[in-house]
C-alpha cells in the first residue's frame, strides 16, 4: 500500500525515528508505523506498528524523543467509525512499547484530530490538537502527561479569540518544559493568520494569544514551531499570495 505523512524526531545520539501512516498496514485500513535509524541513515531493525487498536483508521502521527532516546507518538484514531479522537503511546529507545495506546482527549463528541506532541528530557510530554465540537467553533486544546503516559492536567483551552475556526496546531518545548503553541486561525474580519501562545510546563498560560505573521494579505496556513533550550522559538508557515502567486 501507499505510505503517507511522515514525521521525524532526532535522538540524542544523532540517530532519528520516523513515523508515518501506512495504507493497508492493519489489513484494510490506515495504520501508524515507525522505524529507527542511525546517524548515518541506516535502518535499525524492521518497521513496527505503533497502534494496537486496528479497527478503522489510524492516521496523521506526530513524534517526540526524550533525553534517553525514548519516544512518544500521538496520532488521529478512529475509535468509532467516522468519530475521530487523539491517541498516544510511549516507546523505549529500542522501540519496545512501554504501554498500550491510550486516548488523549477527554471530550469525545465531534472530531479531535491534527495532533502534535512535544517531549521533555525526562520523558514527560504534551499533546495539542484541534477540537471540532467541544465549543461553538473549532478550537485548540492541550494536555500534559508524565513519562508513563498518565495525565497531569485536564484538557486546557489554548486559543482565546472567537471566530470561524482554529486548526493545525504545532507545539514545541524549551529545556524547562515551557511551551509554545502555534496554530492557524480564521477570525471574524480576518483571512487566515498564524497565532501563538506561551505556557509553562504545567500548561498555565504565560501570555495571551498573539499574531505571528506581519503580512496579512492573502492567507497564512499550516504553521510549525521549534524552540531552543533557552526559550527562543521559530515559527514557519505557508503564505498564499505573499510572493505574488502561491506559497
PLM regions: where:
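Extracellular, repeat-based ectodomains that mediate carbohydrate processing or recognition
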Residues: 1-247
Amino acid at each position: 500500500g501507499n505510505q503517507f505523512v511522515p514525521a521525524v524526531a532526532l535522538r540524542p545520539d544523532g540517530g532519528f525515528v520516523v513515523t508515518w501512516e501506512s495504507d493497508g498496514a492493519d489489513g484494510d485500513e490506515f495504520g501508524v508505523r515507525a522505524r529507527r535509524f542511525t546517524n548515518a541513515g541506516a535502518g535499525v531493525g524492521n518497521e513496527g506498528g505503533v497502534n494496537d487498536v486496528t479497527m478503522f483508521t489510524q492516521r496523521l502521527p506526530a513524534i517526540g524523543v526524550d533525553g534517553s532516546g525514548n519516544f512518544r507518538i500521538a496520532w488521529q484514531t478512529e475509535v468509532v467509525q467516522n468519530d475521530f479522537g487523539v491517541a498516544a503511546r510511549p516507546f523505549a529507545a529500542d522501540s519496545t512499547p512501554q504501554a498500550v495506546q491510550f486516548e488523549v482527549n477527554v471530550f469525545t463528541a465531534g472530531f479531535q484530530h491534527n495532533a502534535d506532541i512535544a517531549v521533555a528530557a525526562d520523558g514527560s510530554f504534551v499533546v495539542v490538537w484541534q477540537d471540532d465540537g467541544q465549543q461553538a467553533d473549532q478550537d485548540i486544546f492541550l494536555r500534559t502527561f508524565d513519562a508513563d503516559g498518565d495525565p497531569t492536567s485536564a484538557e486546557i483551552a489554548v486559543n482565546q479569540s472567537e471566530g470561524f475556526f482554529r486548526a493545525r496546531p504545532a507545539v514545541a518545548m524549551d529545556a524547562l518544559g515551557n511551551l509554545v503553541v502555534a496554530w492557524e486561525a480564521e477570525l471574524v474580519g480576518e483571512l487566515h493568520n498564524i497565532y501563538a501562545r506561551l505556557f509553562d510546563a504545567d500548561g498555565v498560560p504565560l501570555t495571551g494569544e498573539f499574531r505571528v505573521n506581519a503580512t496579512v494579505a492573502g492567507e497564512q496556513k499550516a504553521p510549525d514551531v521549534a524552540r531552543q533550550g533557552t526559550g527562543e522559538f521559530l515559527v514557519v508557515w505557508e503564505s498564499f499570495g505573499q510572493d505574488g502567486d502561491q506559497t
